Amino acid sequence: YTYPFWWESFRPYLYQNCTPEKKTYDLIIIGSGYTGISSAIEACSQNLKTLLIDQSALGEGASTRSAGMVSGGLNLGKKINLFQEYGNQIATDFIRESIDSYRFLEDQINGHHNDVKYQKTGRLVLAHSKKKVEALKKKTELLNSLTNLKLEFLKDVNHEISNDYYKGGMLVHDAASIHPSLFYKFLLNKALRCKLDIF
């Protein structure tokens, strides 16, 4: 059995602090990944009596296994055209909400960048064909018209990456890396300071 590289810094563990039988809760959350534990922290901040349930070690699933590259608004609509599927207003709202989630993350870890190994790295999205270059150029223009991401379309990417393969790219300044397991530890410590029942 092998475990993820990220667990060398923090390994998920089994934890219970209650026996929930015959108790009443305002909210029961099933699953203790990023979504579950973040929801539990928010619920506790609103004085909701909350129970967080997980059958496995806390954060053992995808949250502490996936590479920690973060940005907002870039990957929406990979499989479908959001604007055709949902219309202009809802598609625009999706994109802006995604960007807001990135800002929310930055607010949550403010003052704790070293604890979670958060670094503003930027991101380079590359295109390998003329068709992909045109699509990326349109995406850059669209996102710049809807947001304040200040994305840069690059006809020549050789000053970013030495290659003979890629025909163009999009430079994203507002992107970062975070250590997924240490970020989970940060959230877990926050949750354990709340009046939160975990089973």
Could you describe each region identified by the protein language model?
Residues 24-52:
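N-terminal Rossmann-like FAD-binding beta1-loop-alpha1 element of flavoenzymes
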Residues 1-27, 45:
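Extreme N-terminal leader/targeting segments of oxidoreductases
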Residues 134, 141-142, 165-199:
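Helical element adjacent to the flavin cofactor pocket in flavoenzyme catalytic cores
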Residues 73-156:
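Dinucleotide-binding Rossmann-like beta1-alpha1 core, especially the glycine-rich loop
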Residues 154-163, 197-199:
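A conserved short coil-to-beta-strand element within the FAD-binding core of flavoproteins
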